[in-house]
A protein has these predicted regions:
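Catalytic cores of alpha/beta
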Residues: 93-103, 142-154, 196-215
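Conserved N-terminal beta1-alpha1 strand-loop-helix module at the mouth
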Residues: 1-103, 206
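Active-site-adjacent loop and "lid" segments of alpha/beta metabolic enzymes
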Residues: 109, 192, 205-206
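Catalytic beta/alpha-barrel core
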Residues: 24-28, 48-58, 83-93, 105-119, ...
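Active-site pocket-lining/capping segments in soluble small-molecule metabolic enzymes
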Residues: 3-11, 191-193, 197-201, 212-217
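Generic hydrophobic/aromatic pocket-lining and core-packing "Φ" positions
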Residues: 36-40, 65, 97, 121-125, ...
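Alpha-helix-loop-beta-strand connector modules within alpha/beta enzyme cores
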Residues: 58-90, 120-141, 171-197
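Anionic-ligand binding region
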Residues: 143-153, 160, 170-179
Length: 217
């Protein structure tokens, strides 16, 4: 990463809370390296946050990040109140996690609660925290959600992704979160992924907010 830019999880958190929407990019959005750069730029200019994924060829991501890091540093200098955050998702093993950190992403998102190859599920949180990245591991079941939410070791992740949210739908998402309504969890970020679209977004937002959590769609 250029020395002119320093990763800051608090900057990511503040921006996520302000914007509330992350636009996920898959392989279909990246026919060429320039496609990724143009799409990320367009998402940023629209006032949202872009998340590329490791479904895109890693070589393409590396090439793109060389340019995107420069644009991010420039945006930070010229518009410090509107940072260009670079997120990456579909990170499924320690090698991809280390690659994401090395490439300079601000936010790293995993689709499941147990990253293949890690000794313990919580290793994801330890690694991203040490790298000063904003980390969001995935969960699906109540036990997986509680594993990250209810910790006494101070290793709660920055947010928790619920995948595949289409299985729950908005009302089911509310039912999943209801038992965990506690004052200490107020404002904790929950990111439903899968089945979130123009028809369902408002429902997910309402159900998550009603349970005291902060919805990031």
């Amino acid at each position: 990463m250029p020395e002119s830019y320093t990763r800051d999880p608090k900057r990511v958190e503040k921006t996520l809370r302000e914007k509330g929407v992350v636009v996920v990019m898959g392989r279909d959005h990246a026919k060429t390296p320039q496609d990724v750069i143009n799409t990320v730029r367009g998402i940023y200019e629209a006032g949202l946050i872009a998340e590329v994924t490791f479904r895109i060829h890693e070589g393409v991501l590396k090439e793109d990040m060389s340019e995107l890091r420069k644009r991010r540093a420039e945006a930070q200098r010229s518009h410090p109140g509107n940072p260009m955050l670079l997120g990456v998702g579909s990170v499924i093993n320690p090698r991809e996690l280390e690659a994401a950190i090395e490439m300079g992403f601000d936010m790293i998102v995993g689709p499941d609660s147990g990253m293949g190859g890690c000794r313990e599920r919580i290793d994801f949180v330890k690694i991203v925290r040490a790298a000063k990245c904003f980390g969001v591991p995935g969960a699906f079941s109540p036990s997986e959600f509680a594993y990250f939410l209810e910790r006494e070791d101070g290793l709660e992740p920055d947010g928790i992704k619920i995948f595949n949210a289409s299985v729950y739908g908005p009302s089911g998402m509310g039912a999943l979160l209801a038992p965990y309504q506690r004052e200490r969890h107020n404002g904790k970020m929950v990111m439903p992924t899968g089945g979130v679209n123009l028809k369902t977004a408002a429902g997910f937002q309402e159900q998550i907010s009603k349970r005291g959590f902060c919805p990031i769609l």
